[in-house]
């Protein structure tokens, strides 16, 4: 609700260009010959559009109705409706998709939202279920080197609230705790934005 209230009024707050993580993810999807992915927490669709422009079929999920509306508008404007489908969805629930449906899953900063470790484990199980044999899950999270870590109101585990937003910060151990059914291929550090946010770029392969 906080996201909906703040970002739907400033629809280009995260920029129009694809994120660094989407550019890196595309290389991996292309290398693995993955052509259909699910994107969780698609936001305003800057990465969704980028993937589709590079011939990847994307099913974009987001909790915010206004975000999904913006993605649909962008998809239509860019003549990408044949490659982009959307769904308003709360990822704390069981995903509606069939088992083994996707070659890849992508999410940028979804795992570091206000989700408990238990909710993250359940989400990871669902991602495992919907990925096909040797499917790839790529996600990014803000890490313990981020300037906001341990700032603001502590909300349990490694979650801190700043300006109304709760962020779940990740250590490498926390990344490794989410490997049930997966093999980690890489954990890479990168920065984003002017602050900058300090993140991990995580690539896991279904086994």
Language-model region placement:
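Class I (Rossmann-like) S-adenosyl-L-methionine-dependent methyltransferase catalytic domain
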Residues: 1-30, 38-94, 122, 136-207
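Phosphate-coordination loops involved in phosphoryl transfer and adenosine-cofactor binding
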Residues: 34
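A conserved beta-strand element that flanks and buttresses the S-adenosyl-L-methionine
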Residues: 106
């Amino acid at each position: 609700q906080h996201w909906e209230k703040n970002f739907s009024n400033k629809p280009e707050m995260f920029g129009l260009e694809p994120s660094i993580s989407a550019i890196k993810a595309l290389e991996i999807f292309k290398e693995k010959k993955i052509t259909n992915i699910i994107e969780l927490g698609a936001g305003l669709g800057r990465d969704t559009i980028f993937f589709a422009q590079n011939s990847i079929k994307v099913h974009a999920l987001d909790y915010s109705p206004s975000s999904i509306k913006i993605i649909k508008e962008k998809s239509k404007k860019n003549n990408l409706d044949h490659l982009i489908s959307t769904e308003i969805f709360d990822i704390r629930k069981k995903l509606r998709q069939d088992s083994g449906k996707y070659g890849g899953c992508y999410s940028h900063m979804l795992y570091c939202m206000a989700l408990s470790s238990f909710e993250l484990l359940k989400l990871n199980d669902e991602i495992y279920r919907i990925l096909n044999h040797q499917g790839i899950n790529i996600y990014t999270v803000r890490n313990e080197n981020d300037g906001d870590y341990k700032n603001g109101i502590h909300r349990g585990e490694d979650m801190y609230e700043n300006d109304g937003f709760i962020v779940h910060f990740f250590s490498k151990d926390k990344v490794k705790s989410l490997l049930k059914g997966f093999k980690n291929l890489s954990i890479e550090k990168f920065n984003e934005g002017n602050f900058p946010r300090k993140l991990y770029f995580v690539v896991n392969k279904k086994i």
